[in-house]
Swiss-Prot record:
Family matches, as InterPro entries: Lgt
Top class in the EC scheme: transferase
Keyword set includes Transmembrane: yes
Family: Belongs to the Lgt family.
Native organism: Burkholderia thailandensis (strain ATCC 700388 / DSM 13276 / CCUG 48851 / CIP 106301 / E264)
Predominant location: membrane
Top-level taxon: Bacteria
EC number: 2.5.1.145
Keywords: Cell inner membrane, Cell membrane, Membrane, Transferase, Transmembrane, Transmembrane helix
Biological role stated in the UniProt entry: Catalyzes the transfer of the diacylglyceryl group from phosphatidylglycerol to the sulfhydryl group of the N-terminal cysteine of a prolipoprotein, the first step in the formation of mature lipoproteins.
Entry protein name: Phosphatidylglycerol--prolipoprotein diacylglyceryl transferase
Length: 296
């Protein structure tokens, strides 16, 4: 078993200002997105559409607003609506954590629609350009989760070579052990807990980096290197992210205030299913519509 290093969540102290790893990873994610965007400008079919470095900078401004506002509101509405409706001022306490990818996705989608309207471009032309820039940011965000030792995975066998002990999960581990003595006996987890006061879990943040970040980036990057029908790249992002997130959720610990929902699926899985369906329908529409004149 591997013990999580239990990093200090603060990366740098600048006088009274504490720069946290999670915020730093957001910055890294946006920088990586800009780098990928500028690499895309070198592709002939992308350059032919008249995209510029200034367009990327402006997109990122809109994107930052969409991620922060959408991510926070998505967490409030999708995950803890009852709490925040009772404590509305706590919605603004973003430094305490609480962001939702699906909310951020909706926020960015609306932000890109506004950008497209202002630039008099088709909305899907913009999202096709942006889609390959997103996975590197997702990977950076999940790395921030891992450094913080949060959003850990479900309990697994201590014999699994990837099993990891998360110090931050010790209280949850004790509750899990009391409720699952049948599995604990099968995997000898009582002995593990006595020795470490923790249980082995999937490092699901690393799975998400691998699937939602690295794998999805390469799929989108190579797919977008050739002209595609308008909407096809956006559709592939929806399918790829939705499928990756749906899969990883089987190894990720559900939110304790929600647990598993209908059919034993998590909230993340239920929010990912519409993405997959929408992506498939959009891909069919894009190729039936035909033509790559407006491809990104």
């Amino acid at each position: 078993m591997i013990i999580h290093p239990n990093f200090d969540p603060v990366a740098i102290h600048l006088g009274p200002l504490a720069v946290r790893w999670y915020g730093l990873m957001y910055l890294v994610g946006f920088i990586l997105a800009i780098v990928v965007g500028r690499l895309r400008l070198k592709l002939p079919h992308v350059a032919a559409q008249g995209w510029s470095a200034k367009d990327i900078d402006d997109m990122m401004f809109y994107g930052v607003l969409g991620v922060v506002l959408g991510g926070r509101l998505g967490y409030v509405l999708f995950y803890k609506a009852d709490y925040y409706f009772s404590h509305p001022l706590d919605i603004f306490r973003v430094w305490e954590g609480g962001m939702s990818f699906h909310g951020g996705f909706l926020g960015v989608t609306l932000a890109m629609a506004l950008f497209a309207w202002q630039r008099k471009r088709h909305w899907l032309e913009v999202t096709d350009f942006v889609a390959p820039m997103v996975p590197t940011g997702l990977a950076a965000g999940r790395l921030g989760n891992f450094i913080n030792g949060e959003l850990w995975g479900r309990v697994t066998s201590p014999d699994a070579p990837w099993a990891m002990l998360f110090p931050g999960a010790s209280r949850d581990d004790a509750a899990w052990l009391a409720a699952h003595q049948d599995i604990a006996a099968k995997w000898n987890l009582n002995e593990v807990f006595l020795a470490h006061q923790m249980l082995p879990r999937h490092p699901s943040q690393l799975y998400e980096i691998a699937l939602e970040g690295i794998a999805l980036f390469f799929v989108l990057w190579f797919f977008s290197r050739k002209p595609r029908p308008m909407g096809a790249i956006s559709a592939l992002f929806l399918i790829g992210y939705g499928a990756a997130r749906f899969t990883v959720e089987f190894a990720r610990e559900p939110d304790d205030f929600l647990g598993l929902l209908t059919f034993g699926l998590s909230m993340g899985q239920w929010l990912s299913l519409p993405m997959i369906v929408a992506g498939v329908l959009m891909m069919i529409w894009a190729y039936r519509r035909g033509g790559a004149a407006k491809a990104a």
